[in-house]
Amino acid sequence: MSETSCVNATVAVVGNPASNKGKGAEVGKQVVELLQEAGRKHGFNVIDVTGESFDDSLANARNRRNEYDYLVAVGGDGMIALGANAVGCSGKPLGIVATGSGNDFARGLELPVNRVETAVDGIVGAIVRGTHIDVDMGLATSLQGGYAVDSSTGDDLVSDSDVPLRPAVNRFYAGMLSCGLDASINDRANHSRLPNGSVRYFVAAIVKLTHMKRYGYHIKATLADGTVEERDIISPLLTVANSRHIGGGIEISPYSRFSDGLLDLVWLDHAPNVAECVDAVSHAYSGKILGCKVFGWKRVRDIEITRAQEGDEPPVLMADGEYVGRLPVKVVVQDRALRVLVPPAVAESQAANTEEKVLEAIKRDHRDPVTGKTDTYYAKRSR
């Protein structure tokens, strides 16, 4: 694509002015100014569709979609989720300026993290050169009895006259749908008064890990080979992953690829003992955490998650760091539904992350690539 292809195009910027005690508004303004400067050089226009809140910004980005050709989301994983829900399945590219405390989706794509000028330069280069990748998303929708909550607080929604509201969940996510321990850690961190995001998350993790609950889930999943599996999972942790990272860099789902048409279900088989915790932590950032036998794993095309008869009540579900709703829910992979602006080097790197490399990692960890079970699969094949 030539440089003239972006002449008269419009780039919209969306941020969350309420984030980081108002600093999000300052960063959003900086991004607008940097893009305007680049637009004068390359011939594109810039508009700001940021609202007064997260939900207001999402509504603006959706309702004004016919006014722009590219959307640039400024903030953390929650703002990436906002962008995904604004332009997902539309073919309009999303640019990412990652300035949050987690930035796990951007990290998985090897995009700049907390480097505003570098991120904007990459977005401008991608617009001018026409470089992008198409990535999968998850679509979470309510089953009967499930409902959405306030995306900012996790509270049940009520009308102006305090009548409880039960709207259905209908939400794209780009990174993780957190259904257990990871959601409860995020929730505690969100309500913490500690000043630093990483410190809030670390302290919340310590508290929740030392008071671990066994949540009760019943799952019905279509696996990668098309077979259907139905079972109870009584576990502290259950995550439906599209990307690899969570919690600011922990590779909880190291086999995930952004464009394989699959989601990865990761859970704890049981509450880990001290030795198992040490083993998991030692592999948390190396891509080898699923070599720890305390974890269960399966690749799925879709999954229904309902409440099991036993186990503790699961917490409010969270996706990409934002509150989603209550079980029951169905999650379906949306194959290559989100177009993301990336520099050419990132596009090449993502293309190099092939299925063969993932299968090598699965084999290294002694797992069956279809059932996810450990040891027995490769023991049989070696006979």
Q: For each predicted feature, which ranges?
A:
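Short amphipathic alpha-helical segments
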Residues: 25-27, 83-87, 107-109, 251-252
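Short, glycine/serine-rich, charged loops/turns that create anion-binding
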Residues: 18-19, 101, 181, 244-245, ...
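Glycine-rich beta-strand-to-loop/alpha-helix junction loops that act as flexible
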Residues: 17, 74-76, 97-101
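Glycine-rich phosphate/pyrophosphate-binding beta-alpha loops
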Residues: 178, 182, 237-255, 322-323
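ATP/NTP phosphate-donor binding region
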Residues: 1-74, 81, 85, 121, ...
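ATP/nucleoside-binding phosphotransfer catalytic cores, i.e., glycine-rich phosphate-binding loops
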Residues: 3-6, 24, 221-232, 251-383
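A residue-level signal for conserved active-site and pocket-lining positions in enzyme catalytic cores
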Residues: 16, 77, 185, 238, ...
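Catalytic core of DAGKc-family lipid kinases
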Residues: 12, 36-38, 45, 49-51, ...
